[in-house]
Amino acid sequence: MALFHGVINSKALMKDTTLSMIVPSDDRKNIGFQGQPQLLILLHGAGGSNYTWSKYSSIERYTEPLNLIVLMPNIEFSFGLNMSNGLNYQSYLGEELPQWAEKTFGLKLDRETTTIAGQSMGGFAAIHTALAYPDKFGKCGVFSAPLA
């Protein structure tokens, strides 16, 4: 398992944006490592960033035995919505980020292999994105989120 922090250019956001990711190691002795990895897009709450999950949780330890790529994008205070100022966070989460993962990691994603989840504001973003893109996300995790 490896943890990376980096910057990618987003067309949906019209800017460079930060992204953290956990990638399974090449050590395939783990039981769950048959086939390609699944994808989890994991979103932070208000006031957080792409560093929040890796800094304040045990996400690395929990995902280590799994064949799972975890993308933790910085969604700022957007609630994961497309905004009138052109910052299209929902498009970024539902379209651009899964496409980026497919190209970067050579994945063939479908709704059975792609999950979106988040805490608080990130949970709001996760459920709204999952409902907007039901063909992309087969699972959605929501932790302590406002749902209105």
Where are these regions (language model features)?
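Non-catalytic cap/lid and distal C-terminal segments of serine-dependent acyl enzymes
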Residues: 1-148
